Regions:
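Tubulin/FtsZ superfamily GTPase core signature
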Residues: 1-111
Length: 111
């Protein structure tokens, strides 16, 4: 049995790499700079300044009402509540996506 990659518009796989928090955003920035192609990059953060310098194609500021763009202050509970607040934005970014890779540092509040 042979396997191959089909070509054509119906065979395109929509892949997203999502960087969450400062560490995840750093990974996304590095992947963009290295020329990684064939994927869409999304930066997700509570810190508005970090998003402003992100190289990601799509940027989602989560917890805008809760953190006022100031970050989660290394508090995972603030990060969780921020994600819940922005659930609809996150879901919209994932529409029509076939595969998602999430990168996060796991050392602060958001990632």
């Amino acid at each position: 049995m042979a396997f191959g990659l089909e070509t054509g518009p119906e065979s395109v796989v929509n892949i997203k790499v999502i960087g969450v928090g400062g560490g995840g955003n750093n990974v996304v920035n590095r992947m963009v700079r290295s020329g990684t192609r064939g994927v869409d990059f999304v930066a997700v953060n509570t810190d508005k300044q970090a998003l402003n310098v992100s190289s990601a194609t799509y940027k989602i500021q989560i917890g805008e009402k809760l953190t006022h763009g100031q970050g989660a202050g290394s508090d995972p509970e603030v990060g969780r509540k921020s994600a819940e607040e922005s659930r609809n934005q996150i879901a919209k970014a994932l529409e029509d996506t076939d595969m998602v890779f999430i990168t996060a540092g796991m050392g602060g509040g958001t990632g």
